[in-house]
Amino acid sequence: MNMRRIDPSKLELEERLVTVNRVAKVVKGGRRFRFAALVVVGDKNGHVGFGTGKAQEVPEAIRKAVEDAKKNLIEVPMVGTTIPHEIIGRFGAGNILLKPASEGTGVIAGGPVRAVLELAGVSDILSKSLGSNTPINMIRATVQGLSELKRAEDVAKLRGKSVEELLG
């Protein structure tokens, strides 16, 4: 997993709002409401990130979430229009199975997972949500899975072999 930071100012990022949730703090005088926003950003070219923001007004919560998402960008290794290999992303009780698909398949994913994959630029993939279906857990599991993907060239280099030797 590559841990170098990605500069968001050099990318043309697109934002997608996944959820806005009204949360309440119960105080002596009643309930105090705030809004929690969950946003995914990506350049549709191998970079994606997600963020959360909380504020008393919805637009402010979204703005904070976008700022947070830009700080958490990851690079997604791709082979053509899909991912290099199958992987299961895990976070909390949420598991996401991501499988490479042949060209023309499209993005087969539900809700929050679809937002992450489309903004990452993956256009052919099969996915299945297993366990928790909470949007934040689904997104975290997807991003965790995508961040652990490796290209055949990288694995071959780590093992000191050629790609041909590796693939048989």
UniProtKB/Swiss-Prot annotation:
<comment type="subunit">
    <text>Part of the 30S ribosomal subunit. Contacts proteins S4 and S8.</text>
</comment>
<dbReference type="InterPro" id="IPR005324">
    <property type="entry name" value="Ribosomal_uS5_C"/>
</dbReference>
<keyword id="KW-0699">rRNA-binding</keyword>
<comment type="similarity">
    <text>Belongs to the universal ribosomal protein uS5 family.</text>
</comment>
<keyword id="KW-0687">Ribonucleoprotein</keyword>
<dbReference type="InterPro" id="IPR000851">
    <property type="entry name" value="Ribosomal_uS5"/>
</dbReference>
<feature type="domain" description="S5 DRBM">
    <location>
        <begin position="13"/>
        <end position="76"/>
    </location>
</feature>
<dbReference type="InterPro" id="IPR018192">
    <property type="entry name" value="Ribosomal_uS5_N_CS"/>
</dbReference>
<dbReference type="Pfam" id="PF03719">
    <property type="entry name" value="Ribosomal_S5_C"/>
</dbReference>
<protein>
    <recommendedName>
        <fullName>Small ribosomal subunit protein uS5</fullName>
    </recommendedName>
</protein>
<keyword id="KW-0689">Ribosomal protein</keyword>
<dbReference type="InterPro" id="IPR013810">
    <property type="entry name" value="Ribosomal_uS5_N"/>
</dbReference>
<dbReference type="Pfam" id="PF00333">
    <property type="entry name" value="Ribosomal_S5"/>
</dbReference>
<dbReference type="GO" id="GO:0003735">
    <property type="term" value="F:structural constituent of ribosome"/>
</dbReference>
<dbReference type="InterPro" id="IPR020568">
    <property type="entry name" value="Ribosomal_Su5_D2-typ_SF"/>
</dbReference>
<dbReference type="GO" id="GO:0019843">
    <property type="term" value="F:rRNA binding"/>
</dbReference>
<comment type="function">
    <text>Located at the back of the 30S subunit body where it stabilizes the conformation of the head with respect to the body.</text>
</comment>
<dbReference type="GO" id="GO:0006412">
    <property type="term" value="P:translation"/>
</dbReference>
<dbReference type="GO" id="GO:0015935">
    <property type="term" value="C:small ribosomal subunit"/>
</dbReference>
<comment type="function">
    <text>With S4 and S12 plays an important role in translational accuracy.</text>
</comment>
<dbReference type="InterPro" id="IPR014721">
    <property type="entry name" value="Ribsml_uS5_D2-typ_fold_subgr"/>
</dbReference>
<keyword id="KW-0694">RNA-binding</keyword>
<dbReference type="InterPro" id="IPR005712">
    <property type="entry name" value="Ribosomal_uS5_bac-type"/>
</dbReference>
